[in-house]
């Protein structure tokens, strides 16, 4: 059996780039909660003792940007300079302007257009991917890396590993077998965890706790064997972290947000963007399409691409590839996808309920991945029953 290795990485919520994603999405939540028609393009950057929020927002909502920044930092665990940022004493800068009237008239006619008339907020192409190798219909390498990161945060916050600090990264290499285009995981080849820690803990304690409390509960035993390689804090020291260790910026973890390097990516980030931004809404609808194709048994693996022009409601193109795993020809599956999914941005927003903010709805997406999550707020994860009678006629 010929196998190959594939690697995916993740970072947890205390990574400076992910901190920025979460702040941007917390701002989006606050705007949409009060005004579902808010037009939001919110970027965040951070460095030692500083968080800056900037971008273009047109909203009727009354938003306390500084409070959102401080609350988000505090909830992650940035409560002192020692851990990388002090939520209550860091400097917060806000540079927010209104959405360009040129964009507003072209996309939504200054809020006068009907949902089916709303154009894409920009040009671009987005990809959705699904695979039958996990219950989540996501790549195993990505699922495991993401869950390790989430578990790191869990054992930090519940006190199981009190030496942990907010920042951390994970990476998992999986050995795969290609079964006529479908991906079959064989074993976990390598597990890498680099986590921020306090001064009190030894490297031996770190390695023991990570194996016992993070790796064992996350990675199924069947994937681990005596040959599995573990790199646990291989640099030897990771005390300085968060924005003190590295600058952070919204939209720099787009592969972690999606499929861990599998499938493809059009390059657009998600966080801080309202649903007229097809970088986000377009990527969500093609994930639902790809997942529905696989979950309905039409293929074992599927990628869907959609593309847009600014101000134009209808997509320019829709593409489907099942990597040779389709039960019917790809052109038939494409026909089914087009019949069952409305790719117009205004209709995506309605069908996936993307104008609803509040309660951390989009904040939740900003750490541990936008896809493969078991949460009713992740409406794009709902599998649509696909009617294929027409396509097979």
Curated annotation (Swiss-Prot):
Subunit structure and binding partners: Homotetramer.
Binding site for ATP: 15, 167-169, 235-238, 246, 252-253, 269, 273, 277
Keywords: ATP-binding, Cobalt, Cytoplasm, Magnesium, Metal-binding, Nucleotide-binding, One-carbon metabolism, Potassium, Transferase
Cofactor note as given: Binds 2 divalent ions per subunit. The metal ions interact primarily with the substrate. Can utilize magnesium, manganese or cobalt (in vitro). Binds 1 potassium ion per subunit. The potassium ion interacts primarily with the substrate.
Protein name: S-adenosylmethionine synthase 3
Required cofactor(s): Mn(2+); Mg(2+); Co(2+); K(+)
UniProt-annotated binding residues for K(+): 43
EC number: 2.5.1.6
GO biological process: one-carbon metabolic process; S-adenosylmethionine biosynthetic process
Key word Ligase present: no
Subcellular location: Cytoplasm
Enzyme class: transferase
Family (UniProt): Belongs to the AdoMet synthase family.
GO CC entries: cytoplasm
Pathway in which the depicted protein is active: Amino-acid biosynthesis; S-adenosyl-L-methionine biosynthesis; S-adenosyl-L-methionine from L-methionine: step 1/1
Catalyzed reactions: L-methionine + ATP + H2O = S-adenosyl-L-methionine + phosphate + diphosphate
Binding residues annotated for Mg(2+), in chain numbering: 9
Main location: cytoplasm
Gene Ontology MF terms in the entry: ATP binding; metal ion binding; methionine adenosyltransferase activity
Binding site for L-methionine: 56, 99, 246, 277
Source species taxonomy: Eukaryota, Viridiplantae, Streptophyta, Embryophyta, Tracheophyta
């Amino acid at each position: 059996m010929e196998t190959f290795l594939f690697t995916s990485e993740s970072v947890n919520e205390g990574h400076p780039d992910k901190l920025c994603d979460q702040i941007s999405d917390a701002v989006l939540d606050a705007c949409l909660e009060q005004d579902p028609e808010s037009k939001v393009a919110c970027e965040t950057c951070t460095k030692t003792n500083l968080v800056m929020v900037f971008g273009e927002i047109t909203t009727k909502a009354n938003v306390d940007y500084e409070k959102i920044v401080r609350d988000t930092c505090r909830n992650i665990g940035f409560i002192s300079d020692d851990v990388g940022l002090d939520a209550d004493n860091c400097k917060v800068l806000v540079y927010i302007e209104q959405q360009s009237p040129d964009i507003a008239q072209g996309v939504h006619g200054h809020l006068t257009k009907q949902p089916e008339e709303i154009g894409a907020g920009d040009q671009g192409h987005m990809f959705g991917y699904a695979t039958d190798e996990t219950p989540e219909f996501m790549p195993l390498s990505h699922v495991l890396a993401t869950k390790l990161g989430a578990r790191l945060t869990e054992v930090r916050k519940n006190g199981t590993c009190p030496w942990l600090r907010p920042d951390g990264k994970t990476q998992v290499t999986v050995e795969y077998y290609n079964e006529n285009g479908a991906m079959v995981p064989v074993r976990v080849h390598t597990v890498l965890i680099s986590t921020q820690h306090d001064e009190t803990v030894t490297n031996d304690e770190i390695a023991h706790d990570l194996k016992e409390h993070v790796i064992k509960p996350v990675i199924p035993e069947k994937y681990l064997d005596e040959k599995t390689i573990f790199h646990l804090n291989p640099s030897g020291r990771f005390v300085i972290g968060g924005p003190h260790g590295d600058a952070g910026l919204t939209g720099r973890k787009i592969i972690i947000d999606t499929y861990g390097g599998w499938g493809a990516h059009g390059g657009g980030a998600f966080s801080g963007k309202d649903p007229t931004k097809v970088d986000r809404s377009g990527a969500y609808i093609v994930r639902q399409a790809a997942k529905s194709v696989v979950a309905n048994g039409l293929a074992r693996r599927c990628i869907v691409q959609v593309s847009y022009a600014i101000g134009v409601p209808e997509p320019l193109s829709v593409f489907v590839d099942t990597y040779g795993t389709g039960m019917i020809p790809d052109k038939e599956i494409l026909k089914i996808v087009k019949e069952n999914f409305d790719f117009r941005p205004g209709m995506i927003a309605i069908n996936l309920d993307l104008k609803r903010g509040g309660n951390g709805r989009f904040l939740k997406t900003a750490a541990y991945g936008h896809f493969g999550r078991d949460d009713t707020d992740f409406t794009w994860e709902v599998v649509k029953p696909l009617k294929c009678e027409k396509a097979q006629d």
